[in-house]
Amino acid sequence: MSGQSSGGFDVVIVGGGLMGSLSALRLADAGRRVLVLEKAVPGAEASSAAAGILAGQSESKSDGPLFDISVESRERYVALAAELRERVGIDVGFRRCGVIEVAETEQALDELERTFAWQRTKGHRVERIEASALRSIEPQLNPGFAGAIALPDDGQVDPPTLVTAIAQAAERAGATFRAGTTVRSVLVENGVARGVEVEDGRIDAGHVVIAAGAWSSLVQGATIASSAVKPARGQIVELSLRTPPFKSVVFGRGGYAVPRPDGRVLCGSTLEFVGFQKDVTVGGLAKILGTITGLAPSLADAKVNRTWSNFRPFSSDGAALVGDAGIANLTLATGHHRSGILLAPATAERVRAHVIDGRTDANSPWNPSRRTSS
């Protein structure tokens, strides 16, 4: 059993976003004394800026372990949402509203169905919607679409509310959050992580977890190569209507629309490698708004509530880094790119298992050994 210290904290988690906060909750529930260090405000970065799509099926174009993890994590949200309502009285906006991906031509619709057909053989729902039915189901969509493929078990959550609820639950369970704290390095002595160095000294702990998102590779000693996890800027536009224009999350060529029950619609997104430049750009907005009005021309009359951008932790091989970092008592939980909200429940369970029991699946596509460096 690892992750216990005779004094101070058993676990220090670097990063107070969704990954760090949910890992803190699970470890605190297991009796660990947990400190979460966040350079800004917990949840202020990519976690709260995400659209919150639970695309366990719709983002999976091929079979394999990553698909299985995605569906597992999506299904964990059923219990997680109920747990948070009970623990802190907050509805995190979990809705199994489904995702539909539209096709512009019959040929594209056939190809889209072939892309997802393998999921049916694994027992998952995949539905083909012809043009006439699509106009009845989602009348606001462009009437020129040839149809769509529906993944009715995918859904959404509201990320800012989710992060707030999890942080509150973690604090009630005994975890400590410290905002405005930049971690410079992991303190390693004789091949064992002993804590972290911050701007005003050191913090000792029995175990260190790196969950700093796009900033993870900047923590010295975290064993994460700069090429393994890097920032990918994503811009989002939030529209406002009197009523939701769609029942489901809608994917189209080059973008998506996420309808909230209160009439807000989150539209995205861009993928830009510009370092940590957080600007919202004319080009980015033009791309998003062009895509969204192509999906539903009536949205051209919607009010623009706000725009923002943030940085997803992009992993160049498409898989996160979760588990054993190759140094004793050091765990990684980063590199989830745009699936961080979806994959947080599965990640937190694996972090808990590694910290408490030392377990990391050597065959997992998330095993950090493929991408870490000393």
Residue ranges and their predicted role:
Residues 25-30, 39, 52-54, 90-95, ...:
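Active-site substrate-recognition segment that forms the wall
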Residues 90-103, 115-116, 127-173, 270-274, ...:
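Helix-loop-beta segment of a Rossmann-like dinucleotide-binding subdomain
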Residues 9-35:
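N-terminal Rossmann-like FAD-binding beta1-loop-alpha1 element of flavoenzymes
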Residues 159, 296-374:
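C-terminal catalytic lobe of FAD-dependent flavoproteins
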Residues 19, 42, 215:
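Conserved Rossmann-like nucleotide-cofactor binding loop
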Residues 149-207:
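Helical element adjacent to the flavin cofactor pocket in flavoenzyme catalytic cores
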Residues 52-133, 137, 291-293:
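Dinucleotide-binding Rossmann-like beta1-alpha1 core, especially the glycine-rich loop
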